[in-house]
Amino acid sequence: MKSQGQHWYSSSDKNCKVSFREKLLIIDSNLGVQDVENLKFLCIGLVPNKKLEKSSSASDVFEHLLAEDLLSEEDPFFLAELLYIIRQKKLLQHLNCTKEEVERLLPTRQRVSLFRNLLYELSEGIDSENLKDMIFLLKDSLPKTEMTSLSFLAFLEKQGKIDEDNLTCLEDLCKTVVPKLLRNIEKYKREKAIQIVTPPVDKEAESYQGEEELVSQTDVKTFLEALPQESWQNKHAGSNGNRATNGAPSLVSRGMQGASANTLNSETSTKRAAVYRMNRNHRGLCVIVNNHSFTSLKDRQGTHKDAEILSHVFQWLGFTVHIHNNVTKVEMEMVLQKQKCNPAHADGDCFVFCILTHGRFGAVYSSDEALIPIREIMSHFTALQCPRLAEKPKLFFIQACQGEEIQPSVSIEADALNPEQAPTSLQDSIPAEADFLLGLATVPGYVSFRHVEEGSWYIQSLCNHLKKLVPRMLKFLEKTMEIRGRKRTVWGAKQISATSLPTAISAQTPRPPMRRWSSVS
């Protein structure tokens, strides 16, 4: 599949518009009546209902998609998504793509909602006998017309008996008639709780779309479901005004609540995202722990580049930066205790803690090779331990391995692990507290890579996007993850980046302008 902005068919075709419509006509001719109904159902909420009701063929639906800018010759991905969902995967060849390519892009480009996907899955699991029983249970409230399982569910939705946040009626029906479908509903609830909500792609972001995607939906779920069940409930929503001062950028962070798969409700995750406004003269403190040398582990060549650019960028953003090099376990505890009690937090809006070192699953190494759990580090800055940071965003960026696997797919090194050490569970990594963000250079179980001269891919990309995307810094963590998928070592390995929760950040342009860094590609 070619990147967005390029045709999925030969650009040498004459009369491209006709050629594209011919492809749509071929797809139409291979779809039956039920396929058309499925397409119409999946487009509810994206295409006006009146237009869908009048559509009698797939080509009618395609015409509406074209009119609504949901489908174009340059970007037919939404149609590919629809064909994938209704299991017409053979027809993807007419869009010059494969089901594997669609699966890879779905986590970041999915248009059909989880709720609509759920209803479609349920409709396929409700046979004629099940449907008859369900209709019998709701006989008094249903019209006297013949219904399919799909139209039955669509009617319940239209009547307001079910919606994405209210599945009680549906659960009761399934529990009575077809209990096995309750698994689908529970799966939907879990996915909705951990869903990464991304804003529409802007023009600047288009260049990132269509490239090889970095993190599959499975990777994301694995990471988020590893978090503690009670963690990061969004009990606070800090608001400190809305005016930038001192020429530094005003940062607004949304969705800083935790992403525990079992406890995060939908309103918290998608509708009531916390908003933090930063309007003080002092943005806050940025602490950088930069470990280069170790007792027996390999030196981390290039880490000074990461520390240097982190320091420069966060100073540019208005933070006071403190760098600590080659920190032992005892020294780390001293740093944590000092920062926990630092009176400067009272005058700041935010706290940033960056760790550049070797690591393992859920833990990082000190320079004397003591393994320190990430949770232990973060727990110093909860509202109870550090009241001055209560209801303020606390951002932790960690450049370190989280496992030993290399994701298959210049001089490069992994931020290596000591295989003799026992792994630490990520379930103990996150404090049960609001207002934390944890950004890891890679998902659990995988190594992260560092160029011995230019620094790590994760940190360099993070800083590059912090600079480049001001003032519309809406997806810098997601973009940091995306660009990781395009970086490869000489042996064809790629790095998987991870963040622990959905986050969007916007900022005003700092003054004076920041100079370019030649070390960042």
UniProtKB/Swiss-Prot annotation:
Residues 231-269 are annotated as: Disordered. SMART domains: CASc (SM00115), DED (SM00031). Keywords: Apoptosis, Disease variant, Hydrolase, Protease, Repeat, Thiol protease, Zymogen. It comes from the Eukaryota. Changing residue 446 to C: Risk factor for ALPS2A; does not interfere with apoptosis in a dominant negative manner. Cleavage by granzyme B and autocatalytic activity generate the two active subunits. InterPro entries: CASP10_DED2, Caspase-like_dom_sf, Caspase_cys_AS, Caspase_his_AS, DEATH-like_dom_sf, DED_dom, Pept_C14_caspase, Pept_C14_p10. GO terms for cellular component: CD95 death-inducing signaling complex; cytoplasm; cytosol; ripoptosome. The active site is at residues 358, 401. Residues 231-248, 259-268 have a biased composition (Polar residues). Detectable in most tissues. Lowest expression is seen in brain, kidney, prostate, testis and colon. It catalyses: Strict requirement for Asp at position P1 and has a preferred cleavage sequence of Leu-Gln-Thr-Asp-|-Gly. It is an enzyme of class 3 (hydrolase). Its EC number is 3.4.22.63. Changing residue 401 to A: Abolishes proteolytic activity. PROSITE patterns: CASPASE_CYS, CASPASE_HIS, CASPASE_P10, CASPASE_P20, DED. Residues 19-97, 114-187 form the DED domain. One of its GO terms (biological process) is apoptotic process. SUPFAM superfamilies: Caspase-like (SSF52129), DEATH domain (SSF47986). Changing residue 414 to V: In NHL; somatic mutation. Heterotetramer that consists of two anti-parallel arranged heterodimers, each one formed by a 23/17 kDa (p23/17) (depending on the splicing events) and a 12 kDa (p12) subunit. Self-associates. Interacts with FADD and CASP8. Found in a Fas signaling complex consisting of FAS, FADD, CASP8 and CASP10. Interacts with RFFL and RNF34; negatively regulate CASP10 through proteasomal degradation. Interacts with RIOK3. It is linked to Autoimmune lymphoproliferative syndrome 2A: A disorder of apoptosis that manifests in early childhood and results in the accumulation of autoreactive lymphocytes. It is characterized by non-malignant lymphadenopathy with hepatosplenomegaly, and autoimmune hemolytic anemia, thrombocytopenia and neutropenia. Familial non-Hodgkin lymphoma: Cancer that starts in cells of the lymph system, which is part of the body's immune system. NHLs can occur at any age and are often marked by enlarged lymph nodes, fever and weight loss. Involved in the activation cascade of caspases responsible for apoptosis execution. Recruited to both Fas- and TNFR-1 receptors in a FADD dependent manner. May participate in the granzyme B apoptotic pathways. Cleaves and activates effector caspases CASP3, CASP4, CASP6, CASP7, CASP8 and CASP9. Hydrolyzes the small- molecule substrates, Tyr-Val-Ala-Asp-|-AMC and Asp-Glu-Val-Asp-|-AMC. Isoform 7 can enhance NF-kappaB activity but promotes only slight apoptosis. Belongs to the peptidase C14A family. This is Caspase-10. It comes from Homo sapiens.
